[in-house]
A protein has these predicted regions:
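Short charge-dense sequence patches
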Residues: 5, 40-43, 55-65, 135
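Histidine- and aromatic-rich ligand-binding microenvironments
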Residues: 5-6, 19, 52-53, 105, ...
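Short hydrophobic beta-strand motif reused across regulatory alpha/beta modules
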Residues: 46-49, 131-139
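A short, polar/charged loop-to-alpha-helix boundary motif
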Residues: 54-69, 139-150
Length: 150
């Protein structure tokens, strides 16, 4: 079974100039935790996850080491969320994301995803975004291909 057999082709995308707020709305409406960022030619330039949205609110590693984290006012930190939503996607997106080709074996893609602890990855063909592959897609494909027989 190959990636193109199970990938999703109905893809919600973002542009690097989009607001983080608009991306979070897309994620909530589609019940997904990651959206690919594309340029004007539909070429993948990054990924944004819900975790990326929250990262600017967290204390950084140096603050954890040098400060007493328990003395932080996490309620006050939470007040920074609206400001984080006003940022541009390009400020928080991950560049050069892990990708997979449509003709790759499904379990090869699953192993890469497992190693990186990713729930979904973009599918790229000739530099163009053609789909997204999720753990759910893989499980559905394997179940209907192999599980229905047993």
């Amino acid at each position: 079974m190959q990636v193109h057999d199970v990938m999703s082709t109905s893809i919600v995308t973002a542009r690097k100039t989009d607001s983080v707020r608009s991306i979070v709305i897309k994620m909530m409406n589609r019940n997904c935790g990651a959206i690919p960022v594309v340029d004007g030619d539909a070429r993948l330039i990054g990924m944004v996850t819900l975790r990326d949205v929250l990262l600017p609110l967290y204390p950084n590693y140096g603050e954890y080491i040098h400060d007493n984290v328990h003395s932080r006012d996490f309620v006050e930190m939470e007040e920074g969320y609206p400001e984080a939503l006003g940022r541009k996607v390009e400020e928080i997106m991950s560049q050069n994301p892990l990708t997979v080709a449509p003709n790759a074996p499904v379990l090869e893609a699953a192993s890469y995803m497992g190693l990186k602890n990713f729930r979904r990855i973009p599918v790229i063909d000739k530099g163009m975004l053609v789909g997204m592959l999720s753990i759910g897609d893989i499980n559905r494909g394997l179940f209907f291909e192999k599980g229905m027989r047993g």
